[in-house]
Regions:
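The feature marks the mature, well-folded catalytic cores of soluble enzymes
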Residues: 1-297
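Short coil/turn segments at secondary-structure boundaries
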Residues: 134, 263-267, 388-392, 424-430
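Helix N-cap / loop-to-helix initiation motif
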Residues: 84, 310, 368-369
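Conserved, hydrophobic alpha-helical core segments of structured domains
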Residues: 302-309
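Intrinsic disorder at enzyme termini
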Residues: 1, 5-29, 39, 393-464
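Ferredoxin-type iron-sulfur electron-transfer modules in oxidoreductases and energy-metabolism complexes
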Residues: 275-301, 317-422
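A glycine-rich phosphate-binding loop feature that marks nucleotide/adenosyl-phosphate handling sites
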Residues: 87, 265-276, 306, 320-321, ...
Length: 464
């Protein structure tokens, strides 16, 4: 049974040049991560500390939420609570309508992607403009982000150049020079920032004991979105809290190094209250996070800081692209988040993992996304989504390994499979795995036989 991820990945792989570029680009980011980590002898200690801080915070969430909201409200910030995506979208719309807002400029926010806020507001007559360059590109392409940090990296410079020409952003036909395109985008976005009547930002971290909203960007779009319009709306998942500034310092040292290999993002902005003469709203969103918190097996998913490191290192993501995943957040962490939100559909992504666990080793908060996926695979039969063919094969393997004589007979007959033409193994229904893999060559003799015959270098079998 081929999943939707596998089918989408097959479509992505029809362009080998793009796949190679995608793979190499993200692997370079992984190498940059390693180089940045190597500069800090205390790197693993930071990861341990980050994991402990996050675990402590999410298991004491009511206390920290009360502390956080009290600090915000003491400075005149209006705090809202949204149980799910529909409530969140409705709250944002009500705030915008109360201020007669027609144009909203946004800083980057994966929470708004999760809640499908943009299409909802646009349907209600609000002009929503992404202020992050990568997000703006995919918005104009009518696509969703393919990565949570670098949302448009699946596109080539030629594709971006053509898009900017079509949209009237660039005016030199065929000019796809990155510096020129960036200059054109800057001019276009500056106009949008100046016209917007409200700005919306996400939130990388919320500091409980000070009430800080911390937003990390490389383009300064969060600062533009909050310093020009008088109305500032913050979209924040309830898991984004850290207890204090000391805790924040740990994550600040990890976030950019894990996400892009930088020591820090170019801009780290702290918002505590509205600008003079303005108004600030913070919308705290649950949208299934309480359910994750109740799950002993998957609670650690809430430790994720959305750095994207698991995607950068994942061999499946790098070679299949972010749009091959059915959930809005792709890659290893997206598999688990999708399963928590809608397992009967998002199970399509559970097979998108080689279980190499490279993602476990790079995750700054030790979420262990690969290990989480392994657990999810064990649960597929409970929700009626296990592949029946795989289940039958597993039963067959159990029988084979529990009967030594049968196993030895199968081992002796295995070389006969070498006579089967490789094309005959490419049956979509019976062997979808074979389509993307080279047929292995079976050895004429097993290692055990060679060892007994004394044909293994450095080892001799001693007969009793």
């Amino acid at each position: 049974m081929s999943t939707l991820h596998a089918k989408n990945a097959a479509a992505f792989n029809k362009n080998p040049e793009k796949v190679t570029r995608h793979d190499k680009t993200f692997w370079k980011v992984r190498m940059d991560h390693d180089a940045a980590a190597a500069q800090l002898p205390e790197w693993e200690a930071l990861r341990d500390l980050a994991s402990k801080i996050k675990k402590h915070t999410i298991t004491h969430l009511p206390h920290y939420l009360e502390q956080f909201t009290a600090k915000l409200e003491s400075r005149g910030v209006i705090v809202h609570w949204a149980a799910d995506a529909n409530e969140f979208n409705g709250i944002v719309l009500d705030i915008l309508r109360a201020h007669n807002v027609k144009k909203l400029i946004k800083s980057k926010s994966m929470l708004t992607e999760e809640c499908a806020m943009n299409p909802y507001l646009i349907e209600q007559g609000i002009d929503v403009v992404e202020g992050d360059l990568g997000e703006r590109i995919v918005q104009l392409k009518k696509q969703r982000p393919s990565h949570i940090v670098m949302p448009a990296l699946h596109l080539t410079r030629e594709e971006v150049g053509d898009l900017f020409e079509e949209e009237g952003i660039s005016h030199e036909k065929g000019n796809d020079d990155p510096s020129y395109l960036t200059h054109c985008a800057r001019l276009s976005l500056h106009h949008e920032f100046m016209e917007a009547e409200a700005g919306l930002t996400g939130c990388n971290f919320g500091v409980a004991d000070t009430g800080d909203i911390v937003v990390c960007t490389n383009e300064g779009n969060a600062d533009m979105a909050t310093s020009i319009p008088k109305l500032h709306i913050v979209a924040m998942g309830i898991e984004k809290l850290v207890p204090n500034y000391e805790s924040l310092a740990v994550f600040h040292r990890l976030l950019a190094r894990c996400g892009t290999g930088q020591p820090a993002t170019a801009f780290t902005s702290h918002f505590r209250q509205a600008r003079p003469g303005g108004e600030m709203h913070v919308v705290l969103v649950d949208n299934g996070r309480s359910n994750i918190l109740e799950s002993e097996e998957h609670q650690q998913i809430l430790q994720c800081i959305r750095c994207g490191a698991c995607m950068n290192t994942c061999p499946v993501y790098r070679r299949s692209g972010g749009h091959s995943y059915t959930y809005v957040i792709p890659g290893p962490i997206g598999v688990s988040l999708g399963m928590m939100h809608n397992p009967t559909f998002e199970y399509n992504n559970v097979s998108a993992c080689s279980l190499c666990l490279s993602c476990d080793s790079v995750c700054p908060a030790k979420v262990a996304p690969g290990s989480q996926i392994y657990i999810w695979r064990q649960s597929l039969s409970k929700i009626g989504k296990a592949d029946p063919l795989k289940r039958e094969m597993s039963v067959g393997m159990d029988v084979l390994f529990e009967h030594p004589d049968l196993y030895q007979a199968a081992l002796r007959m295995a070389p006969l499979a070498n006579l089967v033409p490789e094309s005959m193994t490419h049956f979509t229904r019976l062997n979808p795995w074979g389509i993307g893999h080279t047929k292995p060559e079976f050895a004429k003799k097993s290692f055990h036989q060679l060892w007994k015959e004394g044909k293994v270098d450095g080892m001799k079998h001693k007969k009793k």
